[in-house]
Design a protein with these regions (language model features):
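Helix-loop-strand module that forms the ligand-binding subsite of alpha/beta enzymes
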Residues: 1-61
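Glycine-rich phosphate/pyrophosphate-binding loop and the adjoining helix
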Residues: 52-108
């Protein structure tokens, strides 16, 4: 996908726009943070403003399932069928709210 965005990169279409990432893994230690960080790199090359989840979000410190400061995440279980936990839902919504709030502040 990113290889097809050369024209947008060259023209700066996404520069200054807020962006966030999210992922799902089978286990709690299945590479969520490294995946989220890797997904940020093309966004940074495009000049996006990366939005994460700050630790002012209480569920970030207490989640036993998904959710990191780098973005929302879900632990799907080995069979991929685990339902979203309440923490995961709250953190995903918090990330969405932050993207919307920052979009408004940036006029993006």
């Amino acid at each position: 996908f990113w290889d097809s965005t050369g024209a947008e990169w060259a023209s700066g279409t996404l520069a200054g726009k807020p962006a966030a990432v999210f992922t799902s893994t089978a286990t709690m230690h299945g590479g969520q943070e490294s995946t989220l960080l890797a997904m940020m790199l093309p966004l940074l090359h495009h000049g996006c403003v990366i939005v994460g989840i700050p630790f002012t979000e209480p569920r970030l410190s207490s989640t036993q399932t998904g959710g990191t400061p780098y973005g929302a995440s879900h632990v799907s279980g080995a069979d991929g069928k685990a339902a979203f936990s309440e923490d995961e839902k709250v953190l995903a919504k918090a990330l969405g709210r932050r993207v919307a709030q920052i979009s408004l502040k940036l006029g993006a």
